[in-house]
Amino acid sequence: MAQERDYYLGTQDDEVRRLGLQHRVWRPHVLDAWRRAHITVGSTVIDAGAGPGYASLDLAEIVEETGKVIALERSERFIEALARAAAARGLSNIETRNIDLVTDAIPASGVDAVWIRWVFAFLSEPIEVLKKLAAALRPGGVIVIHEYMDWGTLNWAPRSAILSEFVEVAIRSWRASGGEPDIAVQLLPMLPKAGLRLKETRPIIHAVKPDNYVWRWLATFIPNHALNLARAGTVTPQWAEEVIEAFAAAQANPDTIMTTPLVMEIIAEKV
């Protein structure tokens, strides 16, 4: 078994479940993007940073047996979770590769499409990975990207001072770790440098009340992230508990409105 390469939020079973919920929230947008990118029966698609494979499973069903999904993931635990799920669905058209997108070569070429979501935001040199993925495409092949454009649009009405502070602290911590939460701002001008031509962009943001399923996406992230910030020594445990209590209070108010971080959908083709 390959050495497990962990993530900030971990690769344990709870995180696998959280990522499943996250994919269910975003699945309508994802399926629509793939359709507009002409991912269809017979396509060969790379799922870059596949995690436990929720997108890979959907892609495998779309491309059917004449197509193929190449799932690239650095966590062996996530790859094992994907293998179990694929077997349960009877899918045999998914190939998994235990690689790191930063340090390893992309083990494919001439593919029809690449799908990547919330990976570039955690990389110190995103242009290098973008170039690798572009090189794996056939001429005219497409890359579909979902990345944050403005994480600071995460907000609540009524306003909460401690939750607003949480957003600011989370962004500062993200950048201090070498990532960039608003990475789409940088990615768009990088496309030509990677041999890609922009076809389409689409901003995605939600404004929801606590009874909307989209709310669950942030509800499974914010309390855990506040605790992780405390464990890292970035904030005090007391501050983290105040964030958790404030979020619980916002959630208990049926009239609260939460706006989500702004995601930019990018579809580009290889020149």
Regions picked out by a protein language model, each given a short descriptive name:
Residues 1-16, 20-21:
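N-terminal, positively charged/glycine-rich alpha-helical extensions of SAM-dependent methyltransferases
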Residues 112-127:
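A short SAM/SAH-binding and catalytic strip from SAM-dependent methyltransferases
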Residues 46-48, 52-104:
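Class I SAM-dependent methyltransferase SAM/SAH-binding core
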Residues 105-113:
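A short acidic, Gly/Pro-enriched loop at the edge of an enzyme's catalytic core
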Residues 144-212:
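Conserved catalytic/acceptor-binding region of the Class I
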Residues 127-142:
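A short glycine-rich, Lys/Arg-flanked "PGG" loop and its adjoining helix->strand segment in the class I
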Residues 181-182, 192, 199-271:
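Conserved Class I S-adenosyl-L-methionine
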Residues 24-44, 58:
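Conserved alpha-helix/loop element of class I SAM-dependent methyltransferases that forms part
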